C-alpha cells in the first residue's frame, strides 16, 4: 500500500483507569461516526462478555474501524483498538499499543490521575506514541478540569494545555476528540521492507470459524488464499477470510499496510496464534519478527476441583474451551487426597482467576471448589538444579532443598497525601522495602518492593480500605529472592490434608499456624468423636485445637446411687468414642479450604 493511501489512516487506542469512562467514550465515537444504527446501540458495545459488562471492566482487546468525515472535508479511516484497564492484563495492553500510532489518555476530571493509567501511559510514550489527553465526566458537579490538567502534567509529565474536556455520557465535545485524533495523531509510517509483517493483537475462538485473530498490518497485505507463517511457532496456515469490525464483522478482499482488522486462517487453537507474534507470507517471509513478543507467564496458581467427582470430564472440556480464548490460562491434571481429581490452573493474577472461575461456573454450569492461590516459588535443590514450584504440597523433602526463592514485585502506588502513613504501614506489614516517595502535585507516588505472595491474596482490598478507595496500584515482576520459607501443613486427626498446605516466611509460621487451627475449629462440624486439628512444620507440631465431640448424657437415668456405676457408664462411653475415632472420617466443608484465604480478616 502506498504512503498516499496510508495518509488518511489513524490507528489509536484509549488508555484509562478502570471506571474512568473509556467504554462509554468508545460508544459515543462509534455513534458519531455512524458505526451502528441508533437502535443497535447499547451501553458498552465493545464489552461483549457478560462478565465484562457486570464488573464494568474490559478483559479482551476489541477493535473497530470507522470512516470519519473531518471538518476539512477529507474522509479518514479511524481504527480504534480497545484495551483492558486492569493490572492483570497489562501485556495485552502493551500489544494493543504497539499496533497504534497514538493514544487517547482518558482521565476522570473528578478523580484525577490513577496508577494504572500512569503505567500504561509510560508504555505508550516508550513506544513513541502521540498521547492526546482527554478529560472525561466534566458534567459532574465535582469535576475540576484545571486540577486534572495539572495532575497529568505533574504525574505523567506530558503537556495537558490543549487537553479536550468532554462528557462521554451526554456526548458533549465528542467531535473535538475526533478532530484531535485526526490532526494530532500521525498516520502510519512506511516501513523499510515491503514483505508482509502483521502483528497479532489478540486471538479468540469462534465456534464456527475456529481462531479469529485481530491483526495490525505493518507492511505488505493479507488476502484470502495467501499462505501465512506464524514466526514464533514456525507453522504455516491458509487464510480463509479477512475483514474489519464496524463493530459488526465485515468481510473485505484484502487488508493493506497500516490497517487493523481480523483474519481467519485454519488455526485450531489460540496457542497457534499467540498474542504479540508476527505473521508473514510463507513464500516470501520477512527477515525478522516485530519486537516485543513474549510468552505470557502465569503468576498465580490454584487448584480447581469439581464438587461432584462426576463433573471432572466436563471441567476438563470447559477448561479446554476457555483456553482456546485465553492464552494466559494454563492447567494440568492434579489429584488430591482431600478433594479427589481436579486441575492445577495458572493465572495472570487474582482478577484473572476470579473471572475464569466465574465463567466456568456460569457458562458451563459447574460447581467448583478452589484451593488457596499460591505464587510460583523457585526451589534450589542440593544437587544444584532449580525447579519452579506452584503447589506447596509438591515441595521436595527439606533435606534435599538448599534454598527457596520467592518472587518479588515492584509496586507503584498513587494516593492523596492524607493516606501516606496508612499505606506505608500496610507495605511494611507485608515485608515490603521502600524504594522512594515522590510528591507530584496533589498526589503522592510511593514505590515499594514487595513479595508477590503478600500481594496476590488481599493486598489490593486492604490498600483500598486504608485509603478509603482513593489509592491505586500498578505492579510488575522484578526477580526471585531467597528467604527462610517453610511449609505449614494442616493435620486433621493425624492425617495431612494436602489442599490446606501453605508456604510462609518462617517468622510468620507460628502465627499463621495458630490462626489456621482456630479458623478450622469454627468451620469443621462437630462429630461423634473429638477432632484434633494441628498445624505442623515438618515433624514439629506448632499449634493445635480440638473440635469437641457431641456426647449423650449417659448419667441421665442414674438417681443418686453408687459412684462406681456412673464411672462404669462414662468409661464405656469413652471406649466407644475411641473405637469410633479409629474408623471415623471427617468430612471437610468447602468453607474450610477458603479459610486459608481469609486468614488476616
UniProtKB/Swiss-Prot annotation:
One of its GO terms (cellular component) is plasma membrane. It is a peripheral membrane protein. It is an enzyme of class 3 (hydrolase). This is Elongation factor 4. One of its GO terms (molecular function) is GTP binding. It catalyses: GTP + H2O = GDP + phosphate + H(+). GTP binds at residues 19-24, 136-139. Belongs to the TRAFAC class translation factor GTPase superfamily. Classic translation factor GTPase family. LepA subfamily. The keyword Protein biosynthesis applies. Its EC number is 3.6.5.n1. It comes from Xanthomonas oryzae pv. oryzae (strain KACC10331 / KXO85). It is found in: Cell inner membrane. The keyword Nucleotide-binding applies. GO terms for biological process: positive regulation of translation. It comes from the Bacteria. Keywords: Cell inner membrane, Cell membrane, GTP-binding, Hydrolase, Membrane, Nucleotide-binding, Protein biosynthesis.
